[in-house]
A protein has these predicted regions:
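Extracellular/lumenal mature domains of secreted and surface-exposed proteins
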Residues: 1-176
């Protein structure tokens, strides 16, 4: 149900949407809180990985994936006695030790290089990935409503980046 308000001498304005059941009021905010409390059960877990798993070196790309699908995720739950249908789509933010990449692609192992980063210095590097799930919900088959608050998952992995060294070899020659 839409809630309207008209200040004295003013125009009518929609101020909220609510659901009524047994004389109890459930607001859109209440429904969004219920969705946020439950969404982690229904969306794929992050299993972030990067390749090479060992032996990463400077000036060569490190290829990564979130471990999630880019497909939308749908689920139904009951909140305050209402059947709530939720549809969400993921997007990702990768933080490669201060270098940020925003994408709608989940990445993958080589040869999928859409999520990659080339480090220019050696050391232990923190890689953080945040999945943002945005979408909409529908209460008892009524009109679809955008989820106003963002639903996030985050994880991080550490990668040691070394320096590649060259070694000259001359098979069959006494001195190179």
């Amino acid at each position: 149900m839409r809630v309207w308000f008209q200040p004295p001498g003013g125009e009518w304005k929609e101020v909220d949407r609510i659901c009524l059941t047994n004389y109890a009021v459930t607001t859109i905010t209440d429904l969004e809180n219920g969705i946020a409390d439950n969404f982690a059960r229904y969306v794929p877990e992050q299993v972030a990985r990067c390749w090479p798993t060992r032996g990463a070196v400077t000036n060569l790309p490190l290829v990564c994936q979130s471990g999630q699908s880019q497909s939308e995720v749908n689920w139904n739950i009951s909140i305050a006695g209402f059947n709530v249908s939720i549809t969400t789509q993921p997007s990702w933010a990768w933080d490669f030790d201060g270098s940020i990449l925003f994408t709608r692609k989940p990445g993958g192992p080589y040869p999928i290089t859409e999520i990659s980063h080339t480090f220019s210095s050696v050391g232990l590097k923190a890689i953080n990935v945040t999945t943002r799930w945005n979408g909409n919900f529908r209460v008892d088959s009524l009109e679809s409503i955008a989820i106003e608050r963002d639903l996030f998952q985050s994880t991080s992995i550490n990668v040691t980046v070394g320096q590649a060294t060259a070694r000259l070899r001359c098979p069959g020659v006494r001195l190179c």
